[in-house]
Amino acid sequence: MNYYLNQSQSFSKTITEYDIYTFAGISGDFNPIHVNREKAKDSIFSGQIAHGILVSSFISTVIGMYLPGPGTIYLKQTLNFRKPVYIGDTITASVSIKEIEENKKIAKLYTIVTNQNNLMVLDGEAVVKLP
């Protein structure tokens, strides 16, 4: 595949309670802010929120499946958590190519996740080895 600057791709998903509980089971992170409706209600978020790393995992979906795609190797990822993601939110993870080192087959990617209101919930940068 040919890659070029500003090439981009996205993936969308509506976050469910099942997603949060499944991620808690896999990760072992049962923080009440994620899994206890009553305790989360009294938090600064006023309700259950998705794990930040669960939200960021959809960046990996884009990188591994769409852009650059299968065969891509993650080398580095920075994440800035901007806003909480709630059950029922539809998030869109997007990746765009910002730099390409052709000779090393390395790309620097801008990564962002937005919610259904087009508000940024997470952003960062990834460095990958191209397939």
Can you name each region flagged by the protein language model?
Residues 65-93:
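Mid-chain, well-packed structural core segment of small domains
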Residues 9-15, 79, 126-128:
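Generic detection of short hydrophobic beta-strand segments and adjacent strand-loop junctions
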